[in-house]
Regions:
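Rossmann-fold NAD(P)-binding glycine/threonine-rich loop
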Residues: 129-197
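Short acidic low-complexity segments
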Residues: 102-115
């Protein structure tokens, strides 16, 4: 296997001639509000800071910055067009939430990462167009193209892992020696496995699905989130939940008997009988794609657009609309435009794949948005981790981390999605002494797929790439796997090089 510093990644970008085209080197080197900071600073850098979800990210960071000791936030993106729209809106929202917090926008990755204490990665190689290509390619073979599982997850890994390898190597050189990296980039668990395999032990995988489900179940019980705990085990987007407790008292029976469990939570995607057959362990919502795969594929095919095509169309409309607004001088109009289109995205979440009814998300003004209670999301998980490390106060959260003996069925180095106890020393996965055969069989198979995918990318092995997709439960076909690899490797050879 290649060492990190031996991996050579060539990626094509449309940018000015004569500019370093490595994504971790930035495109234009532009920087906004980059005045010198004096005194003690704690710097958090967001790679992919021009993403559409950035305003939610900066709100959470701004509100939690003081408790976490963060004084400076840098939003970096390789796309100046996105950064100076969504990143600028995010910066202005963050400044309104916390005027004392220093924000900066830049397309220069080295400047963004220099002396960083914490890094959040939320990138999307090949943008929305890549997602559309991945989905349609998979569907043309009759298999699911969802971007975090199966063929779609494999394709996204091809364009995510090489970029993040470059960023991690740059961070190792220029960031603080004890820098922590929170990977939000999908497929989060697989990407985290690839980075940990290469020796980037400062990387933790984060997904907001478990924390979102935790919030739903606490609301179902009518208790504060701080009083409610549960255990998560499995892989990212392939996990189950058990050990439900309020103030230490087991409430599993109450949850299973709750009349609204299958209406008010993500359990609405599953049949109660399936949960009973599964031993009454509650599944992550993405297990819908495994247990109802044919239904998901047929629902997508019967729709006029895939999820990726829907997102691409909405984002293109939003991008054009924001071109007509002076964001610096009319944040209210810019934010209204942003939220109007963002609501369209969220209202369609999981509806194309399941055939379910769309959501109905309101469009708040910027001031209403700032006043609304913060949901935390991805940033909330990262900030809670930072605070626990700083104070030594023990808390629990779900992360993708090396198994390290927590689950005896898997190797110590296997990255798994587990409930961890966080303290001043770091993350400690809680033991999972026994996994029922029904779940264990699926986890083992998908973990083998993940490890083979990582090896295929790092070793540039065509054989391992085909093997990985052949054994994946959502493909399970050698001819289809081979055809998918042939198509994806050609599209993404600018990221992974030539597979042989």
């Amino acid at each position: 296997m290649n060492r990190p510093d031996e991996i050579r990644i060539k990626i094509k970008f449309v940018c000015r001639e004569g500019v370093d085209r490595r994504p971790w080197a930035g495109i234009m080197g532009e920087e906004e509000n980059g005045r010198e900071r004096k005194g003690s600073t704690m710097k958090l850098t967001v790679l992919g800071g021009g993403g559409v979800r950035s305003p939610f990210l900066t709100k959470s960071i701004a509100l939690g910055a003081q408790a976490a000791g963060i004084t400076e936030v840098v939003l970096m993106d390789s796309s100046a067009a996105k950064l100076y729209k969504y990143g600028k809106i995010a910066k202005l929202v963050g400044e309104r939430c916390n005027p004392a917090l220093h924000f900066m926008l830049t397309t220069d990755a080295e400047e963004a990462l220099r002396d960083a204490d914490y890094i959040i990665t939320t990138i999307r190689g090949d943008a929305d167009e890549g997602r559309v290509f991945d989905e349609r390619t998979a569907l043309s073979h009759g298999v699911l193209g969802q971007e975090t599982t199966g063929a779609g997850g494999f394709a996204m890994a091809l364009r995510s892992i090489p970029i993040l390898t470059g960023y991690c190597e740059l961070a190792r050189r220029v960031a603080k020696p004890n820098v922590l990296i929170f990977n939000f980039t999908n497929p989060s668990g697989l990407v985290t496995q690839a980075l940990r395999t290469q020796g980037y032990d400062m990387v933790y995988g984060v997904c907001d699905a478990p924390s979102g489900f935790h919030k739903q179940l606490a609301a179902l019980l009518g208790v504060e989130r701080e009083r409610f705990t549960m255990r998560c085990w499995g892989l990212n987007h392939l996990s189950w939940f058990d050990s439900f407790r309020v103030d230490g008292e087991d409430v599993t029976g109450k949850i299973l008997a709750a009349p609204r469990l299958y209406q008010d939570t993500e359990m609405k995607h599953f049949d109660p009988e399936l949960v009973r057959l599964s031993g009454n362990f509650l599944p992550n919502e993405y297990l819908y794609f495994y247990y109802y795969s044919n239904r998901a594929v047929q629902s997508i095919l019967s729709s006029s657009k895939t999820r990726g095509e829907t997102i691409l169309e909405i984002n293109q409309k939003m991008h054009r609309a924001l071109d007509e607004i002076d964001i610096d001088h009319d944040l209210e109009a810019a934010f209204h435009c942003f939220m109007l289109h963002y609501a369209m995205r969220e209202n369609s979440y999981f509806t194309i794949e399941t055939g379910g009814a769309p959501k109905n998300i309101d469009v708040p003004t910027v001031e209403e948005f700032i006043r609304q209670p913060d949901g935390g999301g991805y940033a909330g998980v990262a900030l809670d981790f930072i605070k626990a490390r700083a104070t030594g106060e023990k808390i629990q959260m779900v992360l993708s981390v090396p198994n390290n003996g927590a689950c005896p069925y898997f190797a110590d180095g296997d990255v798994m999605e587990l409930t961890c106890e966080i303290d001043g020393e770091g993350a400690h996965p809680l033991p999972v002494p026994e996994i029922p055969p029904m779940q264990l069989n699926l986890i083992r198979t998908v973990k083998l797929y993940e490890n083979l995918t990582v090896e295929a990318i790092l070793e540039k092995s065509y054989e391992k790439a085909v093997k990985a997709l052949t054994i994946h439960p959502l493909i399970n076909s050698y001819p289809i796997a081979k055809s998918l690899v042939d198509t994806y490797k050609e599209r993404y050879k600018g990221y992974i090089g030539e597979l042989s």
